[in-house]
Structures are given as structure tokens and as C-alpha cells.
Amino acid sequence: SRQNTYVFSEKHVRLFWKTRTCFSKDFSYLCPMEKTKRYYEYGKFLQERFDHKVQKISINAGFTCPNRDGAKGWGGCTYCNNQTFSPEYCHTEKSVTEQLEEGVRFFSRKYPDMRYLAYFQAYTNTYDRLDSLIRKYEEALAYPGVEGLIVGTRPDCMPEGLLDYFAELSQRKFVMIEYGLESTLDKTLVRINRGHTHEESESAIRRTAAKGIYTGAHLILGLPGESRDEILHHADVLSRLPITTLKLHQ
């Protein structure tokens, strides 16, 4: 199906769709200046929405996950190690404002006029009381130069009241919700201790997109036990979902 879905990595796209594609083979109608590419780059997605450079600033707001605290399991996902992708300044003893200050200080050296998106990245960033969540989001939005939020979360941790908040916020700020799907196969989700089903993933994506919110999905390629055909089948499944962006990990 023809969807305006943006992806993060050419290498991952080539691997994922080596023998098939979930999009039309002719992308010229979507991207006339990029005829050699069969996907939209994430950078282009941002360029089309901002008239200036924007940079994500990662934040560790001190959240946990339901498969870490006993609500759905213990220990978290089998592969989880947030330290592998968290910047040095992301420490929970620092406030949201302090983490933004350090991130902005780093990037503003090269691009003084840069604007920013607060990226709530570590663990499940919608897994707390609604008032506590909104307070942290609003703290980030109040920081000078921050023009929106990107919130990483699980598909089983998006209450309707929070979706309503994001829907209202998206009318005046950039808002994207990124869901960790990781796999479209329930047997794999059990194996890696995710604690949710693919049906829950599809439901969360459709509910979020239906409210007009930019909706992203994360997928891991090469999880234990998945065959090549099963990995390629992820493309067929995801192409039927109303996602805005897709990030592929391996």
C-alpha cells in the first residue's frame, strides 16, 4: 500500500526489503527528487515539517516497564540495555530540564540556531500516573528552543486519557509516539519477555493514528528463532498499519 512512512536507515531498508517491498516499486510519485531511493528518509520527514534544523535530545525521565517491575514480569526484555544508546548526560538523578540543558549545550556548539525535540527514550515513557507524566512532558516543552515531543513507549501502556492529551498537544506542538513492536510474531514476543501481543501493538498504532498523532514503530531484525521468511513477513504486516515512521534495529 502507498503510505508516507519514513525510515531511519538505508542499510536496514536494503536488508529488510531485499527480495520484496511493502511499497510500490515506483517511488517517483512520492519523491521526485529522490528517484534512486525507495523510501523516505527520516531527515526529509523533519525537513518537510520544520523550516529550520531540529535535533532530538534524549531524556531519561526515570520510568520503568511493566515487564521489569512485576506487573507483567521481571527483568525486562531479554536484550534490554539502555546504556548502549543513552547519551552520557542521561542520568535519572538529573531533572528533565538539566538533561535538556546538557544536550542543547552539546549540539548548539555546531548549530547555534538549532531547535529541539525532547525525546523521552529510556524504558516506557507513558508508564506512570497521568499527572506525573504530563508534568514531565510540560517541563520539557517549557525549555527554550524545544518545539515538540517524541515519546517512546510500549503498545500496552497507552491509556485513552493520555492519548487525548497528546491529541490536543499535537494541535500546537510536534508530537510523535514511537511504539516498540520489536516483532510481529507472538512466539517471539514471548521468547524475548515483552509481555504484550502483536494484537496489542496493532491496536495501539491504530488508536494513536486515528487521533491524528504521528505514529512510529520500532522493529528488531534477526531476533532468535525467526526465519528469513518470517522476517520478510514483518514487512507485509507493517505495510497494513498507519505508521508514520519505522525504525529498524539489528
Write out the residue ranges for each language-model feature.
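Core AdoMet radical
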Residues: 83-103, 107, 111-130, 145-158, ...
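Acidic (Asp/Glu)-rich catalytic clusters
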Residues: 107-111, 136-144, 166-174, 206-210
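Short hydrophobic alpha-helical segments enriched in small aliphatic residues
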Residues: 5-7, 13
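N-terminal [4Fe-4S]-dependent radical SAM core
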Residues: 33-76, 81-117
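Conserved C-terminal portion of the radical SAM core fold
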Residues: 199-250
